[in-house]
Amino acid sequence: MYSSGVDSREKLVEAMAELMWERGYSATSPRAVRELSGVGQGSMYHYFPTKRDLGLAALDHNCRVQLDSWKAALKGLEDPLEILSAYLTLPRDPLKGCRVGRMAQDKAVVADDGLREPVAEAFARLREMLVVVIGAARSQGCLPAGLEPDHLARTMVAVVQGGYVLAMAEQDRAPY
């Protein structure tokens, strides 16, 4: 799965991140991570004494990857409405879910503040980006003056995350 130039720690983080995205944190076993990464048990426990330690690194990785993809997709656009539209219509794999949002559905992640906080922080940063754009659209008269940017940003994120939930529940890409 990985090139020889990737170190063992990075292989473990990337494998755990991928498996967490596919299966969730709770359903991802250290053995599955070792098998996917090709890294031995001794090396895994050298870098990550516990599954939680590896999970934290993988959550940080997934949150960073997701935030970077949101930023990259919106980069270069200047019209606020075009930016908002681009966010809503980003290419997604609805049957796989959001790298970040899937973690908010995992009971073990939600029950552990250390695991939950990177997820909450990623959504907060996304909302902050959207609030700036919504504020610009409102200032330019493209959106009603009475519209609350934070409320609309939260609604937009909820709509996208809800689309993932519907797609997975129905095993249908139609919500996108």
Where are these regions (language model features)?
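Hydrophobic/aromatic residues within well-ordered alpha-helical segments
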Residues: 8, 51, 58, 62-66, ...
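Amphipathic alpha-helical packing segments from all-alpha helical-bundle domains
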Residues: 64-68, 97, 113-139, 151
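All-alpha amphipathic helical-bundle segments outside canonical DNA-binding/catalytic cores
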Residues: 82, 117-122, 139-155, 174-175
